[in-house]
């Protein structure tokens, strides 16, 4: 599970539905990203980082 991704989303006050809409993906797909069941494309990662106003290291490096 990507706890950092979920934590950052919650910190920004966004729902999975809002993130999915902004990324133009289904809520189920976004949920799989947060659970670590599906890998994101580079384009999706970049959109997500912009949306969450953070750096790659903030979410994906441990």
Which residues make up each language-model segment?
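Short basic helix-loop element that most often maps to the first helix and adjoining turn
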Residues: 3-22
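Helix-turn-helix DNA-binding elements, focusing on the entry/boundary residues of the two helices
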Residues: 5, 16, 27, 42-45
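Key DNA-contact positions within bacterial/archaeal DNA-binding proteins
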Residues: 17, 27-31, 57
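Recognition helix of helix-turn-helix/homeodomain-like DNA-binding domains
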Residues: 25-39
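DNA major-groove recognition helix of helix-turn-helix/homeodomain DNA-binding modules
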Residues: 43-58
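Phosphate-coordinating loops and pocket residues in cytosolic domains that bind phosphorylated ligands
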Residues: 61
């Amino acid at each position: 599970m990507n706890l950092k991704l979920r934590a950052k989303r919650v910190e920004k006050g966004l729902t999975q539905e809002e993130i999915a809409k902004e990324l133009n993906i289904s809520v189920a797909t976004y949920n799989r990203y947060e659970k670590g069941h599906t890998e994101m494309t580079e384009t999706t990662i970049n959109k997500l980082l912009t949306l969450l106003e953070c750096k790659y290291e903030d979410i994906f490096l441990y």
